[in-house]
From Swiss-Prot:
One of its GO terms (biological process) is lipid biosynthetic process. It comes from the Eukaryota. It comes from Danio rerio. A motif (Histidine box-1) lies at residues 131-135. It is an enzyme of class 1 (oxidoreductase). Residues 117-248 form the Fatty acid hydroxylase domain. The chain crosses the membrane at residues 39-59, 103-123, 167-187, 329-349, 362-382, 410-430. The gene is agmo. It holds the Pfam family FA_hydroxylase. One of its GO terms (molecular function) is iron ion binding. It is found in: Endoplasmic reticulum membrane. This is Alkylglycerol monooxygenase.
Amino acid sequence: MAQVEANNVTVSQGFRMLFSLMTPEESSFATVEEVPKYVNQATPYFIGLILLEIVLGWLKTDGPHIKINDFITSLSAGMMSRLPQLMMRSVELSAYIYIWDNFHFLELPWDSAWTWWLAFLGVDMGYYWFHRFAHELNILWAGHQVHHSSEYYNLSTALRQSVTQQFSSWIFYSPLALLIPPSVFAVHIQFNLLYQFWIHTELVKDLGPLELILNTPSHHRVHHGRNPYCIDKNYAGILIIWDRMFGTFAPESDKVIYGLTHPIGTFEIWSVEFLYYPYLWQRFWEVEGISNKLSVIWKGPGWTPGKPRLGDIADIPQITGEEKPHDPAWSPVMQAYVILQFFLLLDVYNSLLLDQMILSELTVILLTAYVLLSLTSLGFLIDQRSNAAELEMLRCVLIMLLHRFGYIKPLLPALAFPMEAFILISTIYWSLQSVKQRTDKMKKQN
């Protein structure tokens, strides 16, 4: 069985964990503390496959092409969704451990292949039901809609995750805690999530007989569609058999148009993550009667008074084939700037995830604040908001301070001076832009 020191995955394991090809022998652990943080270690593999998808998309004349604004927003949502786990253990795992410690009535052996495979099936079925309820209950949809807000379908879309989703998903895995040790669950909850990364692509078409058993890119494309035939279909994580068993399966047929039935039209990360909650609150107060108010929360997002629990499929906007994703024009120079700043941020973020156990509490707090400020500021730049210049100026000043005091270090020591020079020039530029915007605003007011 896997040993305590095996907290870092090998390159082979790194790729295999993305396709649920790890064996029980190499991924069984006696305690939760021994379980590798597979998701945190997956970042380089995510980036590698995303770059491969981009290259293959360029080589194909009709291949999918990445939009920088959508790409950065998806990665930003994924980064934000992982930040709470810097401060605390995941809610899913914490709840599971509590139930295990207080209520389990049977302790299956952690080093048994039978336990491993039972956990594989149990977690996957639990995910199916959580995912289904996340589409059928408006209060859960408020979190899950983040993942569906992209109007594109590529590997970066897989990383567009919700901050709040974990606060409800634990419920659907709790029965497993009555007999399956937490260390086994901690492995499979990560593997289930990682598998779902590679199926977010248009490059893989049909996988033959595997389509009967596994959730594949074709099946999951349907799930992300806003075509009427795609709504509330294909909830599977790894095994598509659950959808076939419970009547929610639909094969890919007409060209899929991706995204929400009512697109959000923004790339600002706080709006992407949380804008549905104020909308839900507004709907709650607009409808009359306590029954209708409760229905706003506990029925589907398409429900209105007098309609079925999940809404009327006839109310779904029809697909014309002329739908265009939200993609406002912005200069190539600004795109290059945002890309460069984002990848500087990504290096800090990845180091924060991997080194959090050896960093001081103050360092973790400062770097987390820096990541949040950066995600916000870059979102403002992409959205071309009026106060983006001032926020970016403040962010650049913070970067210089963190770098000067050793909280941020470049990937290579030789890059220290170029990085400082770039940030200094950026600070000056955004300061001048801020002054110009304030001056122009004052002139208009006068």
